[in-house]
Amino acid sequence: MKSLHANLLRFGVLVSCLALPALKASAQTDADALMIPKNMFCAAAVYDHSSWNDYWEGTFKRNNLNIGTLSANSYMFMGNYGITNKLDFLFTVPYITTNASAGTLHGQRGFQDLTLTLKWLPFQTEIGKGVFTAHAILSGSLPLSNYDPSFLPVSIGLGSTTISLRGLLNYQVGRFFVAGAAQYIERQNIDINQNAYFTTHEIYSNNVFMPNMNNVLVSAGYRSLKLNVEAIVQQTTTLGGFDITKNNMPFPSNTMNSTTAGGLIKYSFGAVSGLELTAGGNYVLRGRNVGQTTDFFGGVLYVFDFSKNHR
């Protein structure tokens, strides 16, 4: 069983450095059970394209000829550093562009939100033929630019500073694993560029109350030293908010619920140590006040070894 522990640590180098933004159904490092070893750093550049034609106005699914197809392109730089074998530090910096294919809405572009994460492995034990681990993940995010969060659906973000805590359980037997996680996200209020707005009633202020959120996910897949294949289903729920009113635009404090299914595949090159490629996609199965989004992503990752014993 000691060899299994060693292999899991090696898998951490190869797999755990991919970190897409929160709420993506992908092999995010804040949502998987892999740790990068001490003094190793994984750098990643990832491109993501998402689009939708239909969206839910409350629970009513519809399209909007004044929007057409809403698309977004995300260019992300991410890093993951092993402080110890049981504590990782991660960051994500995304640059986002949006576009509506119809109507008069002008697409937006700019840096979105910086996300910083600490990922801790406090518990690990052998159960049967596998290894069971428990993780605690603390994350925070804040806007990197002065974008307009109220210009939905083409805004590049919601403009809220957040802090979140995720608990994750994972069980791996050989090269196969299953995992589950739950996350609570606290969001600060935001200011918008107008002095009054309507939710369920008229509010004379530029300050918007942002309801908190939670997220639960289950994942399963296959991991080896060269190949990683993973499937993920997750549910995101807003703890409050209100529905988009008929024929109106979305608002930052809307209830935004979604059930998403996704998957990824990642390959590590034996000929070039540390070089990896990844690709995957996600689809919103059902939602409330969100678009029925399809997205695809691809990226390049490279692992640097800064350990003193590296030769």
Predicted regions: what they are:
Residues N39, S71-Y75, R109-L114, F132, ...:
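Residues that define the transmembrane beta-barrel architecture of outer-membrane proteins
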Residues C42-V46, D88-L90, T117, T133-I137, ...:
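Residue-level detector of the transmembrane beta-barrel scaffold of outer-membrane proteins
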Residues A45-Y47, F77-Y81, F91, L116-W120, ...:
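Residues on the lipid-exposed face of transmembrane beta-strands in outer-membrane beta-barrel proteins
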Residues Y47-N53, V93-N99, P122, G140-N146, ...:
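Transmembrane beta-strands of outer-membrane beta-barrel pores
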Residues H49-S74, P153-S155:
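Surface-exposed strand-loop-strand hairpins of Gram-negative outer-membrane beta-barrel proteins
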Residues W56-G58, N63-L65, E202-R311:
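Outer membrane beta-barrel transmembrane domains
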Residues T104-V208, S253:
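Outer-membrane pore/translocation modules
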